[in-house]
């Protein structure tokens, strides 16, 4: 199975048991599994990475202001990477749970 196929299968498995209100597996995020060689600065390692598309958040603010104001926050893309340095490369189920926990901090 290719890394892309393994990542999709892991995402679906995580989705089946995750009970979080927000879950990376339900959202439209790019989810990949990777392996890094010993020559890589973070290697040898393996892990998962998600990329969350940015967006604009707008809200009307009336409290503590003489006039109603519109507050707009424009956020770019966010990338979350989890690196595992164990001796058994593979897409561990715990990596999906960790990336979901980090996703919920965003």
UniProtKB/Swiss-Prot annotation:
- What are the alphabetically sorted keywords of the record? Early protein, Glycoprotein
Q: Where is the signal peptide?
A: none
Q: Which domain of life is it from?
A: Viruses
Q: Does the keyword Glycoprotein apply?
A: yes
- Give a single Pfam family match: Adeno_E3A
Reply yes or no: does the keyword Cytoplasm apply.
no
Glycosylation sites noted in the Swiss-Prot or TrEMBL record: 77
Residue ranges that the Swiss-Prot or TrEMBL entry lists as coiled coil: none
Q: What is the annotated role of this protein in its UniProt record?
A: Not yet known.
Q: Which family is it part of?
A: Belongs to the adenoviridae E3A-2 family.
Under what name is this protein listed?
A: Probable early E3 12.1 kDa glycoprotein
Q: What is the lineage of its organism?
A: Viruses, Varidnaviria, Bamfordvirae, Preplasmiviricota, Tectiliviricetes
């Amino acid at each position: 199975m290719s890394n892309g196929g393994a990542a999709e299968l892991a995402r679906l498995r995580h989705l089946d048991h995750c009970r979080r209100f927000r879950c990376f597996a339900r959202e439209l995020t790019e989810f990949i599994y990777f392996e890094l060689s010993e020559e890589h600065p973070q290697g040898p390692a393996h892990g998962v990475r998600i990329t969350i598309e940015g967006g604009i958040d707008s809200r009307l603010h009336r409290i503590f202001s003489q006039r109603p104001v519109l507050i707009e926050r424009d956020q770019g893309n966010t990338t979350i990477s989890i690196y595992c340095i164990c001796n058994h490369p593979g897409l561990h189920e715990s990596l999906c749970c960790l990336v979901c926990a980090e996703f919920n901090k965003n």
